[in-house]
Amino acid sequence: MFCVIYRSAKRDQTYLYVEKRDDFSRVPEELMKGFGTPQLAMLLPLDGRKQLVNADLEKVKTALKDQGYYLQLPPPPENLLKQHLEGEGKN
């Protein structure tokens, strides 16, 4: 199984995985509007892989089969102040 990964033109660190290059037919129109013009990031073989860097491999495969796409959102921002205070035992 291969997938094609596109970077969002509107949202930093947001990626859209689809099964075929330039085929967004199964991606909801509202999602595409919010995503912006997709920018090709890479073609990626999924078979034989044990993991992906920022996404759960099984969730990606399941989403591609069931809905035709997978949307990878950026990780939540770090709250450095909270981490610092917790490190000092303060809340």
Curated annotation (Swiss-Prot):
Source organism, top-level taxon: Bacteria
Domain YcgL as annotated: residue spans: 1-85
HAMAP family in the cross-refs: UPF0745
A Pfam family: YcgL
InterPro entries: YcgL-like_sf, YcgL_dom
SUPFAM superfamilies reported in the protein's UniProt record: YcgL-like
Protein name as annotated: YcgL domain-containing protein Ent638_2370
